[in-house]
């Protein structure tokens, strides 16, 4: 018996097997849900939903948007930062 299998309870699966068998939950696209078709750089309330607490743009897999929408969000966030509507980084603690 392998050392890791010896410590395992009977009938228990390894974490890797359990993760492989689990079906990933489908992300709901927040822009489609709200009916937003155009992402404006002046809409800072919307853009803040796609920025982390550290000021980074969140990934597609986290937000659930399409690749085209992700590019539009990135462009809008960068424009808003340039126009001083959004900070480049988060405030220091």
From Swiss-Prot:
InterPro entries: Ribosomal_bS18, Ribosomal_bS18_CS, Ribosomal_bS18_sf. It comes from the Bacteria. GO terms for molecular function: small ribosomal subunit rRNA binding; structural constituent of ribosome. Residues 1-27 are annotated as: Disordered. It holds the Pfam family Ribosomal_S18. One of its GO terms (biological process) is translation. GO terms for cellular component: cytosolic small ribosomal subunit. Keywords: Ribonucleoprotein, Ribosomal protein, RNA-binding, rRNA-binding. Residues 1-11 have a biased composition (Basic residues). Part of the 30S ribosomal subunit. Forms a tight heterodimer with protein bS6. Binds as a heterodimer with protein bS6 to the central domain of the 16S rRNA, where it helps stabilize the platform of the 30S subunit. Belongs to the bacterial ribosomal protein bS18 family. This is Small ribosomal subunit protein bS18. It comes from Salinispora tropica (strain ATCC BAA-916 / DSM 44818 / JCM 13857 / NBRC 105044 / CNB-440). The lineage of its organism: Bacteria, Bacillati, Actinomycetota, Actinomycetes, Micromonosporales.
